[in-house]
Amino acid sequence: MEKTEGKIRYGLIGIGAQGGSYARFLTNAPAPFPGMVCAPCPDNCALGALCDIDPEKEKMCKEQYPDVPFFKDWKDMIASGTVDAIITTVPHYLHHEISIYAMEHGMNVLCEKPAGVRSKDVQKMIACAKAHPEVSFGIMFNQRTNKLYQKIKEIVASGELGEIRRSQWMINSWWRPDSYYQQSAWRATWGGEGGGVLVNQAPHQLDLWQWICGCLLYTSPSPRD
């Protein structure tokens, strides 16, 4: 695929449920479910390349996106010149490795949440991003695009409710059926996710909580005087 003038070419690493969603979005493909509404892809974005180690995913990608280069090795994709930015939708333990390598090779990076499993790996990733201001780096928290949460943040930020002194975030609608965990072999495994709900669903809620109410200033095991 030749470079499209004025467009950011995205390379997708990992073509599972989430990677497939990105591919459909970047190509303005029809929604996968009847009645589902999908936002149109911005005019300055394009699907540049696809990458996965699964032969079945390779077959599917070549059938659905015959004009898009496919790679089995993400390092080969980064070096190919077919992409300007990458999006990682891979097992959590790989997030920092791929992101750091890509930034060090001049690539813009959008990493799916969570940032990682081990705090030391995440700190390395953050340090790399700071060391390479010439590239853009971000963690994808898609719930921030939800208009409900955007409105809540707007109300809180306006001061309409006064100063937030204490907050409690309760979510009881984020259960997942077994079909969700069967989408990919690495889901709900220590080797793939690195934890349970605190690594899978909870990052969305923790992010929304601090995004809307502000970052935690202190912790205390008992009430302050």
Regions found by a protein language model. Name each.
Residues 218-225:
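Conserved small/polar residues in nucleotide/adenosyl-binding loops
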Residues 9, 46, 82-84, 108, ...:
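Structural signature of beta-strand start/N-cap positions in the alpha/beta core
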Residues 31-33, 40-43, 105, 130-135, ...:
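Short helix-capping segments at alpha-helix termini
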Residues 16, 22, 65-128:
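Beta-loop-alpha module in the N-terminal Rossmann-like domain of NAD(P)-dependent dehydrogenases
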Residues 45-49, 84-86, 196:
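Short active-site oxyanion
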Residues 140-147, 171, 175, 179-217:
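Mid-domain beta-loop-alpha active-site segment that forms a flexible
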Residues 1-65:
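N-terminal Rossmann-like dinucleotide-binding module
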Residues 116-179, 190:
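A contiguous active-site-proximal alpha/beta segment in oxidoreductase catalytic domains
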